[in-house]
């Protein structure tokens, strides 16, 4: 693949004394693994560019699963993520790395990713809505088709006040029992529209995407979630100290 492509680095690690191994999400080739030769050397002009959340143009080639990075240019500065939004971005990157197969084209998902990162960078409030929209988009691109608007048992439109149990590969069926796998019709309509007007619908969306993504992630926990759990107590402690000053 010798043409230029839009891309983002999802993750990088040292590869030999002077090179980097990159996990990259590209517009045309999907997720690819690239060796950036000499990128760690002092004279390399790629050091600053090959960072997560920096919009790139890349060229690469070679045979086998691991390709060689030929050229890379930063289209703009890295999108400004920090604190909660940084951990949210790392979560999105890890999610893509875990669930997408190598060299499978996901051009529409690439732009869903771009919009998510842009939303995180510009977020003045909670990053949760942007994360839930991306997770739902990802599930759709993976072929995870769910009808949120109709009861799988009767085919009737969902009712805002009724409760529905989610059953994998079937959909939502009316239920009298309320537990972690049940959602109201109001929740389901919010999931269908990807609009979350209140905390309740956001929490329901998070519950659903956790359930739906679990088969793709297997039993291995996400590292970014653990980092976020460690970050939150430290953030609260800093806020408490500031308030006590």
Curated annotation (Swiss-Prot):
DNA damage listed as a keyword: yes
GO annotation, cellular component aspect: bacterial nucleoid
Homology family: Belongs to the RecO family.
Protein name as catalogued: DNA repair protein RecO
Keywords: DNA damage, DNA recombination, DNA repair
Coiled coil residues, start to end: none
Biological function: Involved in DNA repair and RecF pathway recombination.
